[in-house]
A protein has these predicted regions:
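Perimembrane helix-loop-helix junctions
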Residues: 172-203, 267-271, 319-325, 330
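Membrane-interface alpha helices of multi-pass inner-membrane proteins
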Residues: 150-167, 173-178, 203-204, 284-292
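Transmembrane-helix signature of polytopic, membrane-embedded enzymes
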Residues: 89-111, 129-130, 145-150, 276-278
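Hydrophobic, aromatic-rich transmembrane alpha-helices
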Residues: 87, 251-287, 313
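Membrane-interface transmembrane helices that cradle and orient dolichyl/undecaprenyl
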Residues: 94, 99, 135-154, 181-184, ...
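Short hydrophobic alpha-helices at membrane interfaces in multi-pass membrane enzymes
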Residues: 141-160, 189-200, 275-285
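Hydrophobic/aromatic-rich transmembrane helices and adjacent perimembrane loops
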Residues: 171, 288, 294-330
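Short periplasmic/luminal acceptor-recognition loop of GT-C membrane glycosyltransferases, typified by
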Residues: 174, 364-421, 434-457, 487
Length: 493
C-alpha cells in the first residue's frame, strides 16, 4: 500500500502542477457574474434568471471579494477547497483504516477531481462535497463521544450549508439524522435528542440564507423561478438515463466500476456496526441518487458518489478495520486485501491517464480564445453605461461581460429557456419578457452564440420569431467572430 500511496502522491503533485494555469471557464464565470451583480446591488433571481441556490452565489461572492475575478484566484480557491476535503477525508477514514490507507483515500479523491480538467474546477457538486463530508464526520463524532451534542449540531450545520448549494443534500441530511438516532439508541442514549440536534442544526444556515435573500428582495423572485420554471420545466429538459450518460464520460465506467468494487470490499471488511462506514455507505447510495435524480448526466454531478466511495475504500486495504481483526467470512478466503490493492493500483492508473488527457484539452483552449476575442470585439462597440444582451449558455458570452464589467438589459444570462416547451405559457411569458426588455432598454449589442444547449446553431432563432424579427429590425449584424455573432444597435433606434 505504501508504494501505491507514494505513486498516488507523486501523480497528484504532477496534476496539481499541471493545473496551475487552468482558466476560469465554463460554468464558473456564470456564477461569478451573478455574484458580481449582487456586489453591484443586484438582486438574485430578479436581476439574474438562474436555477442555482443562493449558497452558490455567496461562495462565488466571497471569492470575488477576496481574490477578484481572475484565473489565479479561482485556481487557488479550487485547490484550497480540495485540500480541505482531503484533510477531512483523512480524518474521517483514519479510525476505520490506518494512516497510510486514509491518506491514499484522500489522494484518490484528489486524483478524481484533477482528472476532470479545468471545467470541473469549483463545480457546485464539488463544493457540496465538503459540507456532506463535514456533516457525516460530525454525526460520526457525535456517536463516538460520551456527550456528542455539539458534534451532532455541527454536523447538522454543515449539512444545512450544503442544502443552500444543492437541495438534494436534504436527503443525506435526513439519513444522517436517522443514523444519529439509531446509533444513540444502540449506545443507550437519547435517540430523539441526537436526531433532533442534527435536524435542528440543518435548519440554521438555510434560515440565515433565506433571511439574507428576503432582505435583498430576492425571496419572491426565487420562489417564482423555482416553482414556475425549475421544478415543472427545467427538471424535464435534457434528461438521460444513468447508463446512457456514462457512455460519454471519459473513463467513467472504469473509474466508477473500480471505485464501487473498492467500496464494497471496504464494507465487507468492516465490523457489523461502524458509524463512519455506515454513513459512508449511505452517502454512496445518496450520491447515486443525487446523480440519477438530476437526470442531466453531467459528469460533475457524480462528485458525491465519488467522495463517499473514496471514504469506503481505505477500509478495503487496511490490515485491520476499526482496530479489530476482520471477520473471517468477510475476507474472501484471504484474498480481499490483495484484490483491493490490485483494484486500487488500476484505478490510480486510470485516473492518471484521464488526468493527462484532461490537462489541456483543445475545447477549453478554444473557449478561452473565444472569450478573449469577444471581449476585444465588444469593447469598442459599447459606451459607458450601455448594456449588452448575450444569447448563450456556457460558450463564454457572460464571461466576456464579466471581464468588461457590463450588465444586460434583461435578467436572462442563458438563452436555452426560450427553446424548450415552446407552447407552455410560462415559456411564452419568458420570451415576451426578453423581447419587451430589449425594446424598453435597447442594448448596445446583442451577441448570439452558435453553440447553446440543448439546441445548437444560429438557426435556433427561427423557432423564436419575435426575437429574430427584433434583431432584424433594430440590431443588424456587425461582427462575425469564432462561434458568435454581434448584432449592434442601429444608430437611429
Amino acid at each position: 500500500m505504501r508504494l501505491i500511496s507514494a505513486t498516488s502522491a507523486l501523480l497528484l503533485a504532477y496534476l496539481i502542477w499541471g493545473s496551475r494555469a487552468w482558466p476560469l471557464i465554463h460554468d464558473a464565470p456564470l456564477m461569478h457574474y451573478v455574484a458580481w451583480l449582487i456586489a453591484q446591488g443586484g438582486v438574485p433571481y430578479r436581476d439574474a434568471f438562474d436555477m442555482n441556490l443562493p449558497g452558490v452565489y455567496l461562495l462565488h461572492l466571497a471569492v470575488l471579494q477576496v481574490g477578484g475575478a481572475g484565473d489565479l484566484a479561482w485556481r487557488l480557491f479550487d485547490l484550497a477547497w480540495l485540500a480541505a476535503i482531503g484533510a477531512l477525508l483523512w480524518a474521517y477514514c483514519r479510525p476505520v483504516s490506518d494512516a497510510v490507507a486514509a491518506g491514499a483515500g484522500a489522494a484518490l479523491f484528489g486524483l478524481y477531481h484533477l482528472s476532470g480538467g479545468a471545467w470541473r474546477a469549483g463545480q457546485r457538486d464539488f463544493l457540496l462535497c465538503l459540507f456532506l463530508l463535514a456533516g457525516a464526520y460530525g454525526v460520526a463524532r457525535g456517536l463516538e463521544q460520551p456527550d456528542g451534542r455539539l458534534a451532532f449540531l455541527a454536523g447538522g450545520l454543515a449539512l444545512g450549508a450544503g442544502m443552500t448549494v444543492k437541495p438534494h443534500a436534504g436527503f443525506f441530511w435526513l439519513l444522517c439524522a436517522a443514523v444519529a438516532a439509531v446509533g444513540a439508541r444502540r449506545a443507550g442514549r437519547s435517540a430523539g435528542r441526537a436526531g433532533a440536534l442534527v435536524l435542528g442544526g440543518g435548519l440554521v444556515v438555510p434560515a440565515l440564507v433565506v433571511a439574507w435573500l428576503a432582505g435583498r428582495g430576492g425571496l419572491a423572485p426565487c420562489v417564482a423561478v423555482l416553482t414556475g420554471y425549475v421544478l415543472p420545466l427545467y427538471s424535464q429538459v435534457g434528461r438521460v438515463s444513468v447508463l446512457g450518460a456514462t457512455r460519454w464520460h471519459a473513463w467513467g465506467r472504469a473509474t466508477f466500476g473500480l471505485l464501487a468494487g473498492l467500496g464494497l470490499l471496504g464494507l465487507r471488511a468492516s465490523p457489523a456496526w461502524s458509524p463512519r462506514l455506515v454513513l459512508a455507505a449511505l452517502g454512496a447510495l445518496y450520491g447515486a441518487a443525487h446523480f440519477a435524480l438530476q437526470g442531466k448526466g453531467w459528469e460533475y454531478q457524480l462528485y458525491p458518489l465519488a467522495l463517499f466511495l473514496c471514504a469506503l475504500a481505505p477500509a478495503a486495504v487496511a490490515r485491520r478495520a476499526d482496530g479489530s481483526r476482520t471477520r473471517p467470512a468477510a475476507d474472501l478466503r484471504g484474498i480481499r486485501r490483495a484484490v483491493a490493492l490490485a483494484a486500487w493500483a488500476l484505478l490510480v492508473l486510470v485516473l492518471g491517464a484521464k488526468g493527462v488527457e484532461a490537462r489541456e484539452p483543445e475545447w477549453i483552449a478554444e473557449k478561452a480564445r473565444r472569450v478573449a476575442a469577444l471581449t476585444r470585439d465588444l469593447a469598442p462597440l459599447v459606451r459607458p453605461g450601455e448594456t449588452v444582451q448575450v444569447l448563450d449558455t456556457t460558450g463564454g458570452g457572460i464571461h466576456a461581460l464579466l471581464r468588461l464589467g457590463l450588465r444586460q438589459p434583461t435578467r436572462f444570462i442563458y438563452d436555452f429557456h426560450f427553446f424548450h416547451h415552446p407552447d407552455d405559457p410560462r415559456i411564452r411569458a419568458l420570451r415576451a419578457e426578453l423581447v419587451a426588455g430589449l425594446a424598453a432598454h435597447p442594448p448596445a449589442a446583442v451577441v448570439v452564440f452558435e453553440e447553446s444547449w440543448p439546441e445548437l446553431g444560429y438557426d435556433r432563432l427561427a423557432a423564436f420569431p419575435e426575437l429574430a424579427q427584433a434583431l432584424e429590425r433594430s440590431f443588424p449584424l456587425a461582427v462575425t467572430g469564432p462561434g458568435y455573432r454581434i448584432h449592434a444597435k442601429r444608430s437611429d433606434s
